[in-house]
Amino acid sequence: YPQMPHVFYMPDIPYRTFYPNEYLPWMKSLEEATDILQQELQTLLAQNAKRFTPYVHSGLDRTVSDEGDLLDNESWTSAYLWQNGAPDTDVMACCPETVKLMESLPLTKINGLAPSVLFSKLSAGATIAPHTGMLNARLICHLPLMVPPECGLRVGQDERQVKRGESWAFDDSINHEAWNRSDEERIILLFDVWRPELNEEERHLITTLLESVRSYRSAT
């Protein structure tokens, strides 16, 4: 399972399926906030559940690799605090502490592309088919908030069981899939951050390149 991003490939980035948490010192504060983040999620579910829509949908302005069963799939839905860099103030209003915590993290910031910060809901008995993400210059982070038994994630050849309050980061340019084999919903907080190996200059160059490509495509 090589790195196979479908938008941008950064050479010479180490191959890691799951990134060691010890290199991401903010993970500890993220896990410590599990209770308050779950409370805000429950507020969102009670007050604005309609914000959950299919994670991959027909009107999405991006290329999705191996989209197959992912497209317009009601069993995998999401409610965004930020989607492709754009804030959703209705969702944010339910989740002020989540917003505050996210703003303290090294989120990937690329105009029109990132960050994306969302609550990701996987229905009972559902699976997310194998797929790859856009960039290998970022990591996708999960904080499980409402997790029944029998939920898991595979990245490359590595599998992990999803457990409430146990966060991780992984390279989503590597083929990955998820499942919920229980009879309850699974909801996690999902967001993207820069890989720690990249310095500020490299991040700026990647940002400038991808913003320029997006601007060109929008004009043609």
Show where each model-derived region lies:
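Short beta-strand His + acidic residue motifs that chelate non-heme Fe in jelly-roll/DSBH
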Residues: 128-131, 152-153, 170, 176-182
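Conserved metal-binding segment of the jelly-roll/cupin
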Residues: 161-175
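Glycine-rich phosphate/pyrophosphate-binding beta-alpha loops
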Residues: 135
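Fe(II)/2-oxoglutarate oxygenase catalytic core
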Residues: 1-118, 122-132, 148-151, 199-220
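A short hydrophobic beta-strand segment most commonly corresponding to one strand
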Residues: 140-144, 169, 184-199
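A short beta-strand-loop-beta hairpin characteristic of the jelly-roll/cupin
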Residues: 145-164
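Short Gly/Pro-enriched loop/turn and capping motifs at secondary-structure junctions
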Residues: 150, 175-177, 194-198
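Short glycine-rich loop/turn motifs
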Residues: 116, 138-141
